[in-house]
């Protein structure tokens, strides 16, 4: 089973396309939506829904995948739920770059500080990060610098921030998922 978390643009038709692409890896792809506006509520909601999906799915090698803001959540929720994660262009600093778009961006700082200390060290090698060299929204070099000590970084030369085409990376994701 693969859990898919959308980015800030929850209504983008690209989300459906990504789900269809991920079904080439596993036919059981679950799209879990969240508000994107209320971080604390989103975290509680995502923990509950992802845990429920894992319990119902019966796949010992479940995976959570997210793009942009969904990548922020995939890394944290996947860690807390004990499943591997794939993050495409994860937005590691929504409190800095989403002011005016979300109600309480400072809640992201609170969430980050309340997460288990050194969670990335404890999560080492359990997240695959795919970054666009042409990310028009985020500084992918900064993201790579923050995550490279803990996770494998795969660079994509063609995609933009929303990462419309996952297909060049599906085999790598499938291999990563089988590691459980």
Curated annotation (Swiss-Prot):
Pfam families: UPF0227. PANTHER family: ESTERASE YQIA-RELATED, UPF0227 PROTEIN YCFP. Belongs to the UPF0227 family. This is UPF0227 protein YE1706. It comes from Yersinia enterocolitica serotype O:8 / biotype 1B (strain NCTC 13174 / 8081).
